[in-house]
């Protein structure tokens, strides 16, 4: 995760993120939905910093009619009241950020309530490698945006996904990919600088071209990655396993909006 204050005026020269700044992924969803000509959307996220960042990022690029913006309780498991209100609002689309168990419960209750006939569901961090083992077929066809996907076509990612599946018997999540990328970044910094000295490693990461599962990454001035963000669809692979696949690139080399406020 990447809270906006850490990317902005609370940044630190010794902090590097190998994930994303919170706004970036929903910014891509906002752009996709804006470009698709979607007229109205109902927004929902948990009431904490990441939830607020996610919806702020979405609205930065989506300029249609936001007919509702609801902040749910962090850790909430029952969404029947919210779904009833959403049904009454009849938005063309719904965009959610409900990570982890919240997303599992939300999508299952959405399906059980027949909400696909009311509104088209879009999401960020709610249907992914973390939740798909529980959601399975109920997540098929749902679109989301992400900086990584198991089908990204580069040598590092192919090896990572194959090795992970061989050891654990399933697809890795983006958390696993980012953990792998973090180790690659540390190794790169030591190799490039020829040292374990903090200042030299910092300089190597800040100016380098870091090899990762997402391709080679450069760091912004606030030490958050400048990276592609993809549109993904939940599908079944050739073996019938539910996963995600890239169906488009929304942003190429996308930088976050808070780096201008970062002063080391």
Residue ranges and their predicted role:
Residues 1-71, 118-143:
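Extracytoplasmic ligand/sensor domains, especially the bilobed periplasmic-binding protein
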Residues 25-28, 72-85, 155-156:
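Structural motif
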Residues 31-35, 78-90, 112:
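Short, well-structured alpha-helical segments in soluble
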Residues 40-45, 90-100, 106, 118-124, ...:
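Periplasmic-binding protein-like
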Residues 44-52, 101, 149-150, 172-178:
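Extracytoplasmic "Venus flytrap"
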Residues 109-180, 191-196, 244-264:
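Extracellular/periplasmic periplasmic-binding protein-like sensory domains
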Residues 197-214:
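Short, well-structured alpha-helical segments that form the helix of a local strand-helix-strand
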Residues 209-264:
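Solvent-exposed, acidic/polar segments of extracytosolic/periplasmic ligand-binding ectodomains
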């Amino acid at each position: 995760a990447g809270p906006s204050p850490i990317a902005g005026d609370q940044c630190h020269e010794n902090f590097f993120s190998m994930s994303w700044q919170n706004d970036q992924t929903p910014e891509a969803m906002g752009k996709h939905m804006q470009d698709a000509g979607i007229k109205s959307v109902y927004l929902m996220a948990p009431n904490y910093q990441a939830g607020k960042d996610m919806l702020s990022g979405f609205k930065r690029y989506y300029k249609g009619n936001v007919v509702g913006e609801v902040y749910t309780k962090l850790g909430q498991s029952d969404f029947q009241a919210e779904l009833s209100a959403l049904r009454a609002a009849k938005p063309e689309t719904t965009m959610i950020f409900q990570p982890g168990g919240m997303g599992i419960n939300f999508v299952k209750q959405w399906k059980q309530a027949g909400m696909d006939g009311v509104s088209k569901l879009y999401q960020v961090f709610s249907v992914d490698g973390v939740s798909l083992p529980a959601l399975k077929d109920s997540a098929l066809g749902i679109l989301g945006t992400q900086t990584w996907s198991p089908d990204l076509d580069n040598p590092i990612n192919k090896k990572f996904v194959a090795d992970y599946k061989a050891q654990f018997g399933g697809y890795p999540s983006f958390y696993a990919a980012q953990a792998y990328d973090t180790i690659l970044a540390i190794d790169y910094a030591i190799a490039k600088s020829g040292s374990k000295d903090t200042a030299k490693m910092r300089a190597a990461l800040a100016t380098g071209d870091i090899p990762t599962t997402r391709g080679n990454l450069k760091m912004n001035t606030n030490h958050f990655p400048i990276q592609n963000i993809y549109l993904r669809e939940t599908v079944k692979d050739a073996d019938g396993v539910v996963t995600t696949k890239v169906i488009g690139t929304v942003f190429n080399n996308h930088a976050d909006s808070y780096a201008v406020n970062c002063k080391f």
